């Protein structure tokens, strides 16, 4: 039986694993975290995607013969070269996602009560630590500021409400028309009472005497000419700073791929954003037998795009192995 392995048990990796298993391959999925599912399990809130549904899909793959190795950080525990050499795998699909959060680099980001959206959503989804007997509580305050305007920001804001926050703000440097989140996500957030503080940007997070967040200072913005993304560039209004009392700040400013795989795989081409470079839609990389897809090549995107990439790559991997 021909063997292939998958790095990452998120939507791209799970889709590729299922398609390869159907084609008769022995597939092993290596997952860095202790539960398979990736963003489906850790990132998307329970009220949007029940975890029992994700587990059903994973259990279905196991019945098809797919093996899952969790707590396996490829690039640290094992490398791609080792797996394709000593372990005898003929091809790999890299679906390791883009889980490295970005921060603003402003004063106060290291205070207690400041989270990345990734950490906040992971904690709120799991509500426990790696060891079943240990808890990793999430401290949600009464007043929460979520910085950013994408779908993940909406998820974080709505999760904070469900965890008991009295007031939740979305702080975004452009206007409502420029919000990158889907229209439906914005409407849901508005319906639930989340307050949108648009055309303003944080400049500092202020501490109390114990090192916890007590407030956030923002500056008003105005929109200038369009930038490279086609959206109008936000420009600071001098002297317009104001302070909001908050006790939790969640940074939802996008993510990038973890550098572990690219730094331990010689000859694997990446771009300036750290994303793996591929040819066409099939996910073929600069390394023979190495395919990639999902957020690992695009940066943070949608689940459906990641699944499509996994499907296309599985087909390409099959063609590659059959023609070897």
Pin down the residues of each PLM region.
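Long hydrophobic segments that form regular secondary structure
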Residues: 138-174, 242-248, 255, 274, ...
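A conserved FAD-binding loop/helix module that cradles the flavin
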Residues: 296-324
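Beta1-alpha1 glycine-rich phosphate/pyrophosphate-binding loop at the start
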Residues: 5-74, 102-109, 119, 153-205, ...
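A conserved short coil-to-beta-strand element within the FAD-binding core of flavoproteins
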Residues: 70-84, 199-211, 221-224
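FAD-site-proximal beta/loop scaffold in flavoenzymes
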Residues: 110-141, 226-300
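Glycine-rich beta-alpha junction loops
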Residues: 97-100, 174-176, 220-222, 257
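FAD-binding core/adjacent interface of flavoenzyme oxidoreductases
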Residues: 1-7, 23, 51-54, 66-143, ...
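Active-site loop ensemble at the mouth of alpha/beta enzyme cores that anchors a bound cofactor
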Residues: 108, 200, 214-222, 238
């Amino acid at each position: 039986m021909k063997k292939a392995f998958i790095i990452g048990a998120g939507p791209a990796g799970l889709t590729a694993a299922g398609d390869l298993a159907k084609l008769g391959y022995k597939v092993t999925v290596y997952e860095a975290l202790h539960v398979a599912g990736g963003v489906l399990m850790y990132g998307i809130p329970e009220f949007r995607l029940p975890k029992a549904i994700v587990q059903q899909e994973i259990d279905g793959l196991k019945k098809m013969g797919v093996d899952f190795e969790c707590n396996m950080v490829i690039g640290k525990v094992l490398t791609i070269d080792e797996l394709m050499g000593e372990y005898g795998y003929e091809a790999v699909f890299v679906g390791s996602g883009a889980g490295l959060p970005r921060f603003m680099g402003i004063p106060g980001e290291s205070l207690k009560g400041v989270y990345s959206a990734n950490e906040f959503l992971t904690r709120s989804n799991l509500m426990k630590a790696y060891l079943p007997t240990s808890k990793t509580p999430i401290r949600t305050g009464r007043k929460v500021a979520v910085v950013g305007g994408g779908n993940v920001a909406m998820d974080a804001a709505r999760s904070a409400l469900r965890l008991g926050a009295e007031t939740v703000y979305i702080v975004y440097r452009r206007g409502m028309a420029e919000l990158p989140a889907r229209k439906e996500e914005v409407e849901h957030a508005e319906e639930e009472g989340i307050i949108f503080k648009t055309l303003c940007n944080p400049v500092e997070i202020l501490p109390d005497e114990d090192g916890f967040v007590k407030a956030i200072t923002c500056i008003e913005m105005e929109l200038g000419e369009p930038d490279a993304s086609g959206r109008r560039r936000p420009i600071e209004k001098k002297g317009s700073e104001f302070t909001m009392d908050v006790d939790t700040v969640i940074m939802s400013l996008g993510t990038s791929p973890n550098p572990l795989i690219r730094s331990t795989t010689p000859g694997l081409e990446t771009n300036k954003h750290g994303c793996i470079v591929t040819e066409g839609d099939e996910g073929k990389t600069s390394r023979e037998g190495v395919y990639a897809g999902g957020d690992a090549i695009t940066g943070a995107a949608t689940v459906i795009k990641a699944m499509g990439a996994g499907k296309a790559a599985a087909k390409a991997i099959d063609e590659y192995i059959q023609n070897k």
